[in-house]
Amino acid sequence: MRKLNPYFGEFGGQYVPEILIPALDQLEQAFIDAQNDPSFQQEFQDLLKNYAGRPTALTLCRNLTQGTRTRLYLKREDLLHGGAHKTNQVLGQALLAKRMGKTEIIAETGAGQHGVATALACALLNMKCRIYMGAKDVERQSPNVFRMRLMGAEVIPVHSGSSTLKDACNEALRDWSGCYERAHYLLGTAAGPHPYPTIVREFQRMIGDEAKAQILAREGRLPDAVIACIGGGSNAIGLFASFIPETSVQLIGVEPAGKGIETGEHGAPLKHGKLGIYFGMKSPIMQTEEGQIEESYSISAGLDFPSVGPQHAHLNSIGRADYVSVTDDEAIEAFKTLSRREGIIPALESSHALAYALKLIAQNPDKEQLLIVNLSGRGDKDIFTVNDILAARGEI
């Protein structure tokens, strides 16, 4: 009998081949046991503090908001070991895998940040590591590929389909179905078959828990809005989870509009997709008129995903969270602006959330507002991509 609800409203579920059901049931039970085991929690918290570097800072952007009445804070997941929020839940899942007696880890990665986090956790915990990555992403994220291999991971380029994240996910699941007795599939986002969306949220929720305590200590009140980018949605649900009960706080998720929603080259299934079943879950998906999975597109590899986590779909359906989109060009402008005005180079993924915050500020410069943006990762991995774009424009 299930202990955790596999659905968020009508979204979620467990649509996988029958062969994987025992592995998912084992994972669910291990997670429940671990959540109630003080020694597991102590080990996890110790790794987060003394290995990963939590809590992360909440940084006030004084320069960006000059001349306005906005106070804009960044939740600095870019300062976490590994360079992004991914490290949080990877450490949790890797400890779970050890607890279940697994010796191998299988993972997928888009921007490479989840791959790096998985590689470092496997090195630390002495586990074999296989990471599937779309061939296109291997090209555009070469620094992260090198980091993964340096830490002992086997990186497997995927050439099928669009050679991006969705194809890497498919290959990782296929691999796992043949070796789940010895391997754990370390899924990188709050999506996929139950119980992954719940596990990933719970192993990321310290982002929002910390941000809430930090903003209350600094400002004496809750923020008016918290803003995060959305690919699969793990950094956003990690930030949102603590604020969902606080109805005065607006939750804003920012999907990638890519080259513009009207061009069809985007990654915004929540607002522009149709309900379907993909990657083991029921959630909005980018689909063709024939019902096939449509290729998503974003300049940021970590947002280039044709579906979205089921809890975001639920929050959208009940109106608790607002989902908007930002184009490649707007994200690049935000990337440049934060780098030049605050000396912080953000990931292109995080730049989408920042771009929307800057829009809000520009629209209401005289409005007193308190905002938190989740700076989900650092931009080292994106400097070559942005350099090429700016060089082509003659801007550098």
Curated annotation (Swiss-Prot):
Q: Which residues carry this modification: N6-(pyridoxal phosphate)lysine?
A: K86
Which Gene3D superfamilies does its entry note?
Answer: 3.40.50.1100
Domain of life the protein comes from: Bacteria
What EC number(s) has UniProt assigned to this enzyme?
A: 4.2.1.20
User: Pathway membership of this protein?
Assistant: Amino-acid biosynthesis; L-tryptophan biosynthesis; L-tryptophan from chorismate: step 5/5
For molecular function, the Gene Ontology terms on record are: tryptophan synthase activity
Function, please? The beta subunit is responsible for the synthesis of L-tryptophan from indole and L-serine.
Q: Which PANTHER family match?
A: TRYPTOPHAN SYNTHASE, TRYPTOPHAN SYNTHASE-RELATED
Q: Which family does it belong to?
A: Belongs to the TrpB family.
Question: What name is this protein filed under?
Answer: Tryptophan synthase beta chain
Task: List the lineage, top down.
Answer: Bacteria, Pseudomonadati, Pseudomonadota, Gammaproteobacteria, Enterobacterales
UniProt lists the gene as trpB
